[in-house]
Amino acid sequence: MEELQGYLEKDRSRQQHFLYPLLFQEYIYALAHDYGLNGSIFYESAEVFGYDNKSSLALVKRLITRIYQQKSLIYLVNNSKQNRFVGHTHNNFFYSQMISESFSIIVEIPFSLRLVSYLKEKEIPKYHNLRSIHSIFPFLEDKLSHLNYVSAILIPHPIHMEILVQILQCWIQDVPFLHLLRFFLHEYHNWNSFLITQKKSIFVFSKEKKRLFRFIYNFYVFECEFLFVFIRNQSSYLRLTSFGTFLERTHFYGKIEHLQIEKLIVICRNDFHRTFWFFKDPFMHYVRYQGKAILASKGTHLLMTKWKYHFVNFWQYYFNFWSQPYRIQINQLSNYSFYFLGYLSSLLINSSAVRNQMLENSFIIDTLTKKFDTIVPVILLIGSLSKAKFCTISGHPISKPIWANLSDSDILDRFGRICRNLFHYHSGSSKKQGLYRIKYILRLSCARTLARKHKSTVRTFLRRLGSGLLEEFFTEEEEVLSLMFPKTTSYTLHGSHRERIWFLDIIRINDLVNRS
């Protein structure tokens, strides 16, 4: 344990001191705007409160000006004791949102500077940082077919917010920062309920404080993986062959290869929605996305059990809470399917007989080949559609009443876009039949929504306008695939359903996929 403590303290030698006077400068709004204000900061809140995204810049300036006046800040703090700062009025709620976002932006500055300096130091070209989310699957196809065991890991979640504050306290010596952070967390007394639930394995961030909670959660996950790197270094005398980080930003993925371990703090940047991290050596491979990770090895079950033991004990020692050993499941790859990144993945074993002729003797050799297979988890997708009110839990399509007040073209466009995005993301599935069931649900849900709007039945509505109206909006993805794979090839979209396609433009996971 002393060795671990020294390992951690060595990396934390560069603790951060934040310049809080920046928070109270009148023109900090310009910095906030350059940091991606038009991207994701106020995307949800602007919809909730009816503000136009174009006016966010003026709102930030107005708020910072009010913060600059200490009376307004004192009023907000005092008023929060009565209204819980969650906002019984739209104004208080929106002001608290703005303060939280500005606070998060300031906190991100030191870590973004470290990332930029590292890229310049290593002279990493920008075009090398672009990488699709689908690029992880060829890596799994290439590596997992040679391995024996896989551990499905759910990153344990902290049971108390003070644990998160203590984690940050190890890195940050700025007392005002910690006090302000505690203030935000205590005011959101029910933050645990919307940050994570017992039934989900990933953190579900609050729409109101998404940026702030992403920052805190990324810090926490970094600490979990920091222990993992320490254990890995202690258990092997060989250096890692290669390792890297996939950082999903607002608009693209960045891949940083040959990243020094002490530089992995860059994953704590708040505007990274989700983070991949993996390393590979001849015998072990690790991949994580959000709060779910897989650890695959060519070793024995005993070796994987030792890894599980180390994980549980180090997490309990470091985070001071029960880390729930059942969150690490060890299974043999040959007879196990695991859900990862919206796909149900497994290792298929195919047997083929080869006749070998040697002089006058002939014999048959049975050859076993392993293949990494990915399919669409139809039941989980139907569950996601059910939560989004497109169908019942059994998959029966229903109307979407909340969209009934939109124009016909907007309704068709929304349903068509969801369907095309799902087809696009699950193009790597070896079995496409499940996708056509999802398409049927969305098409009929669209028809029911239009019929509800026009106060008619689905049959009457389709008879009047024709079923081709819906077909036009749901076939774009299939037309693209037809252009990519001409009829002269063996690929047919409605034929074998076995071809897998990994696209290089998948920059984020679909929300419906993420729910499942």
UniProtKB/Swiss-Prot annotation:
The keyword Ligase does not apply. Keywords: Chloroplast, mRNA processing, Plastid, RNA-binding, tRNA processing. It is found in: Plastid, Chloroplast. It comes from the Eukaryota. Its main location: plastid. One of its GO terms (biological process) is tRNA processing. GO terms for cellular component: chloroplast. InterPro entries: Domain_X, Maturase_MatK, Maturase_MatK_N. One of its GO terms (molecular function) is RNA binding. Belongs to the intron maturase 2 family. MatK subfamily. Usually encoded in the trnK tRNA gene intron. Probably assists in splicing its own and other chloroplast group II introns. This is Maturase K. It comes from Galanthus nivalis (Common snowdrop).
